[in-house]
Amino acid sequence: MKVLIIGSGAREHAMAWAVARSSKVSTVFVAPGNGGTATMGGKVRNTPVKATDIDALLELVAKESIGLTVVGPEQPLEAGIVNRFREAGFKVVGPTAEAAQLETSKVFAKEFMKRHGIPTAGYEVFRDYASAKAFLETCPTFPQVIKASGLCAGKGVVVAMSRDEALEAIHEFFESRIFGDAADEVVIEAFLSGQEASVFALTDGQNYQLFLSAQDHKRIGEGDTGKNTGGMGAYAPAPLVTPEVMRRVEEEVIRPTLAGMRADGYAYTGFLYVGLMIDKGVPSVVEYNARLGDPETQVVLPMLKSDLFDALLASVEGGLEVVPFEMQEGAAATVVMASAGYPDAYETGKVITIDPTVNDMEGVLVFHAGTRRDGDALVTSGGRVLSVTACAGSLKEALDRVYRAVDAIEFEGAYCRRDIGAKAL
């Protein structure tokens, strides 16, 4: 079968790599893909169609007789790509625009959790500056967490440690409009203490299969300092998510979420990412995402021993509960190599040199994000450039392998965090 992966990041490179391993897959199209998917060869090829150009994607699927489409990023989900593909009779992995509101509207998600008794922080919703300001001026405790309701590429959250910081944040959201329409509604919620981890499921709306848990590193600086990013590294499994914690997550979060979505008339299909805060073994939901995370995908997919394609197809056709879904023993880690200046302004077009020894390093995979081909050269084209992954028998060994590979890759101004996974060692 021919498969289409929509997106251009390291997440989509990892998906293309995983799907191409299946003997049942003949060709993997990546739209638009990146410099890494362009040079994978074998079954994988890029096609120059934007991830948000739904009409052109529908044309591509019809023309190439593509049997299954997998949506990587959130923007096409919000735009209703799954609805359009289903109306046209095409098989697609992902939630409808209505179901994807679990990610695309923080207000929808919080109200959904409250309605269905899913553990999450207490919250208030505001639709204008004056009411949010009045609330914060009388708010007795800080920190408070301030979130733009809409999509902000993972950057629309401020943990305000003081009243002044909180007031500044809502001014930026409502008055300076730094996130535009995405901050027309703002959620202010209680700060949850604990450690964050993520759990990922693939679901047909009723049945589900679980990937390994993971922890990512959102901040740009070591020691989790500085600005939020799309994610600077990750590892799996997360030691924090013990079998007992995972049992609670299934019982208190995943099953009630799927049942609640069915009850509300928005059966949820595709990937479900649950961002959790875990405090003394008790999980609370920080956020939902309607797709796999980036960089977490780059650690959870390499740890999947079974055929990903079989599971993806079953999530659309049925039979997901009986599909093999086995994980490897050991651990995986990924480190993001970013452009100088990221997450603020950065330059692109820097030549990337990957030492040939990297190809022979045991357990190492280099997934591309902000890269493109420029003639024979590979050059940078984004803030997050590469996601260097390694699998091994232990997290320590995986991290050793990753950093060995990172040290064999060069581009001007390359930056990475050197403490990925340190708190789990």
Swiss-Prot record:
Signal peptide: none annotated. It catalyses: 5-phospho-beta-D-ribosylamine + glycine + ATP = N(1)-(5-phospho-beta-D-ribosyl)glycinamide + ADP + phosphate + H(+). Pfam families: GARS_A (PF01071), GARS_C (PF02843), GARS_N (PF02844). Binds 1 Mg(2+) or Mn(2+) ion per subunit. InterPro entries: ATP-grasp, ATP_grasp_subdomain_1, PreATP-grasp_dom_sf, PRibGlycinamid_synth_ATP-grasp, PRibGlycinamide_synth, PRibGlycinamide_synth_C-dom, PRibGlycinamide_synth_C_sf, PRibGlycinamide_synth_CS. GO terms for biological process: 'de novo' IMP biosynthetic process; purine nucleobase biosynthetic process. SUPFAM superfamilies: Glutathione synthetase ATP-binding domain-like (SSF56059), PreATP-grasp domain (SSF52440), Rudiment single hybrid motif (SSF51246). Pathway: Purine metabolism; IMP biosynthesis via de novo pathway; N(1)-(5-phospho-D-ribosyl)glycinamide from 5-phospho-alpha-D-ribose 1-diphosphate: step 2/2. The keyword Magnesium applies. Coiled coil: none annotated. Its cofactor is Mg(2+); Mn(2+). Residues 110-317 form the ATP-grasp domain. Mg(2+) binds at E287, N289. ATP binds at residues 137-198. Its EC number is 6.3.4.13. NCBIfam families: purD. Belongs to the GARS family. This is Phosphoribosylamine--glycine ligase.
